[in-house]
Amino acid sequence: MSEELLQATQAIPDLVTKAIPDDERLWVPQADKIWFRPLILNTTNGEWVNLLRIAKGGVMNRHRHPAPVYGYVLKGEWRYLEHDWVAKPGTFVFEPPGEIHTLVVDEEVEEMITLFHVFGALGYYDEDDTLIQH
């Protein structure tokens, strides 16, 4: 291993943490029945990775991302009102840039937890596709 590579690998220590914490204080309230657990917040390139937790009956309002989003369901299940599929544990989800969707956890599901890898902003839209918040 080159000296430069060795120095680079030693400059940043490993980070190993329990992804789904027992400590409720690590979940950040986002909206009614919705919490997130930040894992990575990269202010250089706008990348973020988090766990999203939504309780039964929870709805993440209509929103869009300007860049791709990748998700992996760890617990429970959820769906988008705009699609006819249901994401269940082990499901990998790709959201194309610019798609507007509404994430729903149905009443019969206790809660869902999904790992999301996001690039860029998140904008919320009304039913006329007008930006209302970002």
Q: Model features per residue range: what roles?
A:
Residues 1-46, 130-134:
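A short, N-terminal "cap"/entry segment at the start of jelly-roll beta-barrel domains
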Residues 50-52, 60-65, 82-85, 104-106:
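Short histidine-centered beta-strand/loop micro-motifs
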Residues 106-134:
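Double-stranded beta-helix
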